[in-house]
Amino acid sequence: MISQASIKSLSDILDLESSNFVRYIQEVAKLRPSRSGDAEAIALFEELYQDSSSNITELSALLADHAAVFPQVSWDMDSARYNFLRPVFLLAPLTDSFRDDIGRLDQLAERIVEAGWEEAQQAVDRLRGQKSAALERIESLAQKLGGLESDPPERSGSSASRW
């Protein structure tokens, strides 16, 4: 029998993946590609988004047998500051987000391991491995494009305050 704690933990992992920063980038942020490197960053974001969608499908299928769970998507209001930026400027926050997600995954996976839920444990291990590989790709692209780009523009005040 699978414990309620492990079901809750897997549900929390589903919520974490559903609220992934790359999903925010693809679904909400209106990116402004304009220079070299932007196309590479956008291609990476699209690939990571597809991976995330596959992960959500897999986790939802595992949970469907045990509970009626729907992903709870929640993005930090602070993420709005990333709207309308060039894609290359989102690589650093995406790196930080993936690092945080991996750490959170490790915490949430403990209850699944303790319960001995083999299928869920394998899914979480795949997700962790996928996120680690993605983190390396993001860092590699950020390093490659880092020399080409300057710091992102600083926003101070609203557009009305600059009139």
Regions found by a protein language model. Name each.
Residues M1-W163:
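Iron-associated oxidoreductase/ferritin-like identity signal
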